[in-house]
């Protein structure tokens, strides 16, 4: 993972991989932190898939999908088809078929989850998806390049069989000028939290002041309360170095109304910070812990790097006070003959090639 870490912290993170910019421009403040999914588990194995619109209502819990194909996500059904110039996607869309497909997954919701919140997170579905749980529609997501989340809690049957169904419609062609793929082409996650928890992507970490001697880190945390009563919540922010040792910390309280959210802000100060660079890709973690009545109810980790940079119209780009020439490539998100479904090893190989060519800029074009 070392070669991937050399890209992290300077620019924006995309899913679990890195890109430098969107449209050629860098979007960042002094620091941008990627919040991980430590409380979530991958929800990608044991799905059933059917290409086309089946007879009957495939969203229903009691629908018989026994004859459907068994597979693991991520999945791109277009790459499995035959190439033809007659496909509506045309050569610009890869000359591969689109169409409509269904995915279904059976899972159990343990009784110990009762009283908690259960969410399903989709990192990417192409395109125009509708998600159902036990026959209940959770919503429709247009297009296909944004992650999205649904709350499963009101529809789950505790200690019983539950069914998640996803309809994916990529039949309107052409709809892009590149190969898009079709299906649930990114990971799916199941997140289980207490009613009081850090909100979705609920931490934002910046470093407004960075030198070789000192760094000031601002940590903003959105605390969500899905309970029936207001809560006074203790918020503890702890900065950890790469070995897990405490560097700085601050705590406080926020009052969070029932069904609402409140923001906690902390300032962490470190001396002699390890500055992130392509040669020294050092990463810290911010651990955010929430407490209600002295009991820990949620712990959330945010990975971040500490560095400072500037663009100068005359001299170019500077990182940590050193001049740096930015070289890179522009790529679409698909993996060639492997299709659009994310493949970790294939992306590692891309980054290895990029690094081997002396490049450090990796914007995704979509």
Task: For every predicted segment, state its role.
Residues 38, 54, 203, 287-356:
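N-terminal carbohydrate-binding accessory modules
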Residues 191, 255-256, 303-307:
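Short beta-strand edge segments in extracellular beta-sheet folds
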Residues 32-85, 89, 163-167, 171, ...:
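Accessory carbohydrate-binding/adhesion or oligomerization-edge regions at the termini
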Residues 113-117, 156-161, 230, 270-285:
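Short glycine/proline/serine/threonine-rich loop/turn segments at secondary-structure transition edges
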Residues 103-105, 146-150, 252, 260-268:
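Short strand-edge motifs at loop-to-beta-strand transitions and within beta-strands
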Residues 133, 214-255, 262-266:
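Beta-strand-rich binding/interaction modules
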Residues 39, 43, 50-54, 93, ...:
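Accessory beta-strand-rich segments of carbohydrate-active enzymes
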Residues 166, 237, 286-288:
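Hydrophobic/tyrosine-rich beta-strand signature of extracellular beta-sandwich/beta-rich modules
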């Amino acid at each position: 993972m070392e070669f991937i870490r050399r890209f992290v912290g300077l620019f924006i993170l995309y899913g679990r991989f890195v890109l430098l910019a969107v449209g050629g421009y860098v979007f960042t403040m002094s620091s941008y932190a990627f919040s991980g999914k430590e409380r979530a588990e991958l929800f990608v194995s044991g799905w059933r898939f059917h290409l086309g619109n089946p007879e009957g209502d495939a969203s229903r819990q009691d629908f018989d999908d026994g004859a459907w194909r068994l597979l693991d996500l991520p999945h791109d059904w277009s790459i499995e088809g035959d190439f033809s110039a007659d496909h509506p996607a045309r050569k610009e869309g890869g000359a591969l078929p689109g169409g409509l497909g269904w995915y279904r997954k059976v899972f159990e919701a343990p009784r110990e989850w009762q009283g908690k919140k259960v969410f399903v997170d989709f990192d990417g579905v192409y395109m125009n998806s509708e998600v159902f749980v036990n026959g209940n529609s959770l919503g429709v997501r247009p297009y296909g390049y944004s992650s999205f989340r649904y709350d499963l809690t009101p529809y789950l049957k505790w200690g019983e069989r539950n069914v998640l169904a996803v309809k994916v419609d990529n039949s309107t062609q052409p709809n892009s000028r590149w190969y898009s793929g079709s299906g649930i082409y990114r990971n799916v996650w199941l997140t289980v939290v207490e009613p009081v928890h850090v909100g979705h992507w609920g931490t934002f970490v910046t470093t407004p002041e960075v030198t070789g001697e000192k760094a000031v880190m601002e940590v903003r945390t959105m605390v969500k309360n899905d309970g029936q009563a207001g809560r006074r919540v203790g918020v503890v922010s702890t900065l950890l170095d790469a070995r897990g040792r405490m560097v700085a910390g601050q705590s406080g309280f926020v009052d969070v109304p029932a069904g609402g959210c409140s923001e906690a802000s902390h300032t962490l100060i470190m001396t002699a910070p390890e500055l992130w660079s392509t040669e020294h890709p050092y990463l810290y973690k911010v651990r955010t812990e929430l407490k209600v009545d002295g009991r820990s109810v949620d712990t959330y980790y945010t990975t971040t790097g500490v560095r400072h940079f500037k663009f100068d119209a005359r001299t170019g780009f500077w990182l940590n006070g050193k001049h740096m020439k930015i070289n890179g490539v522009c790529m679409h998100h698909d993996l060639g003959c492997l299709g659009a479904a994310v493949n970790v090893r294939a992306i590692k190989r891309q980054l290895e090639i990029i690094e081997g060519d002396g490049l450090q800029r990796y914007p995704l074009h979509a």
